[in-house]
Structures are given as C-alpha cells and as structure tokens.
C-alpha cells in the first residue's frame, strides 16, 4: 500500500505536519466541490431562464 493511499505522509514526521498535510488536502477537495456546485447552479439557472423565454 502506498503511503498516500492510507493517509500518511512519510516525510511528515510530527503530528502537526501530518495535520497540516491533511488540512491542505481537505481544503483542496472542498474548493473543487464548491466550484463544481457553483458551476452546476449557474448552469441550472441558465437552462431554467431559457425555458421561461
């Protein structure tokens, strides 16, 4: 099993470094999720407006 698969980072030795690494990964995932939701909402609004016209 690769170190990245089980959530550990081999070069990160301290608990604080591990937490920082996990937080950065989660923030990146959350950012992508937010962007996808915003894109879908805008797409839905545009399609809804076209149907009303």
Curated annotation (Swiss-Prot):
Which conditions up-regulate this protein? Accumulates in seedlings within 6 days after a shift from dark to light.
Source species: Arabidopsis thaliana (Mouse-ear cress)
The record's region (Required for DVL/RTFL small polypeptide activity) falls at 14-45
Spell out the protein name for this chain: Small polypeptide DEVIL 16
Pfam families xrefs: DVL (PF08137)
- Where does this polypeptide localize? Cell membrane
The beginning of the lineage is:
Eukaryota, Viridiplantae, Streptophyta, Embryophyta, Tracheophyta
One term under GO cellular component: plasma membrane
UniProt topology in membrane: Single-pass membrane protein
Q: Which GO terms describe its biological process?
A: negative regulation of cell population proliferation; regulation of cell population proliferation; response to light stimulus; shoot system development
Q: What does this protein do?
A: Small polypeptide acting as a regulatory molecule which coordinates cellular responses required for differentiation, growth and development, probably by restricting polar cell proliferation in lateral organs (e.g. leaves) and coordinating socket cell recruitment and differentiation at trichome sites. Regulates the positional cue and cell proliferation along the body axis.
Tell me which domain of life the UniProt entry assigns to the organism this sequence originates from: Eukaryota
Q: In which tissues is it expressed?
A: Mostly expressed in stems, flower buds, flowers and seedling shoots, to a lesser extent, in roots and young cauline leaves, but not in mature rosette leaves. Barely observed in cotyledons and leaf primordia.
The protein's matches in InterPro entries, at most eight in alphabetical order, are given as: DVL, DVL_RTFL_regulatory
* UniProt KW keywords: Cell membrane, Developmental protein, Glycoprotein, Membrane, Transmembrane, Transmembrane helix
